[in-house]
Amino acid sequence: MRSLLRWMGVLLLCGLCAAPAQAERIRDLASFAGVRENQLVGYGLVVGLDGTGDQTTQTPFTGQTLINMLSQLGVSIPEGTNMQLRNVAAVMVTAQLPPFARQGQEMDVTVSSMGNADSLRGGTLLMTPLRGVDGNVYAMAQGNLLIGGVGAQQAGSSVQVNHTAAGRIPGGATVEQEVALQLGRADGTLDLYLNESDFTTAQRVVEAINRDFGSPVAAAMDGRLIRLNAPSDSNSRVNFMARIQNLDVTPNQGPAKVIVNSRTGSVVLNREVTLDRAAVAHGNLSVTIDSNPQVSQPNPLGEGETVVVPDADISIQQEGGALQMVNTSADLMDVVNALNALGASPQDLMSILQALKSAGALNAELEII
């Protein structure tokens, strides 16, 4: 029963992956060259915090930023003033400028604390310029933060749910400068990039496009790039691109792969994974540390001090691992059942999969993240 619960996540994945490959729209498989988002970043201040902001004595850049901002607003602070503020926090503001964004359009921003602020809940981001990689300002951000976490502390005890040092402002930035996008190459052709390189999928996309248009308007350059003969007129080109995006194509099934997350112990298999017949023996190794500090209490009339003497017992136990047969499995469900039969924990399973791969019994690419 425990083994079944342990593999519940993998079984759910199997249910999703067991069905045959279905046709997908080209817009879900590829994107046109030049149609991309651009990263923006800015530095600003969040005010209005309820005593949960930066400790300005430990984060001097917060106080320096506040002084500079006040001077721009006509407020001068005497030199040497030691401002003890807890309602202000220095933050980094990030956003993604969508393609074809026009002046005046709004976009969401993410606000993250830079200093030692406890929480940004209830704060307001002051006007912050957002710059691109070229240093130009493309948007201005300002607004009230939406924080998904909550925390409280009192008398040395604290509790926190989710993260309180970062939040979002829906529609918190306004586009001030547009990014010029050029659709197509100088020779009039238009490039289409597959999200994942695959020669079979590229061939199927080309065949679907040429079949729909009734002429060879598409040609595959390699496993990712498809070159299109697009109309020169802008309106006709948009119609051409929209027509291509809505065509259905059945993508090629990807290679067999096993993903292992060494930090969390998660193991994920896709539907192409198969096993060859092999024998597996794996012994579980457990280390137990039992710490029982002892208090040494001297005689009340003697000259001595009460001290705590550490006392720890360490034991190592290894369970014997008998050889177990793993039969040939050509179906993903058979693979899951064969691995479940070993009764191994996720951490042990990672070692078993690596050994099966080395022995040539695991017919899949093993990727550790």
UniProtKB/Swiss-Prot annotation:
GO terms for molecular function: structural molecule activity. InterPro entries: Flag_FlgI. Transmembrane segments: none annotated. It comes from the Bacteria. Residues 1-23 form the signal peptide. One of its GO terms (cellular component) is bacterial-type flagellum basal body, distal rod, P ring. It is found in: Periplasm; Bacterial flagellum basal body. Keywords: Bacterial flagellum, Periplasm, Signal. It holds the Pfam family FlgI. One of its GO terms (biological process) is bacterial-type flagellum-dependent cell motility. Disulfide bonds: none annotated. Belongs to the FlgI family. The basal body constitutes a major portion of the flagellar organelle and consists of four rings (L,P,S, and M) mounted on a central rod. HAMAP family: FlgI. Assembles around the rod to form the L-ring and probably protects the motor/basal body from shearing forces during rotation. This is Flagellar P-ring protein. The lineage of its organism: Bacteria, Pseudomonadati, Pseudomonadota, Gammaproteobacteria, Oceanospirillales. The gene is flgI.
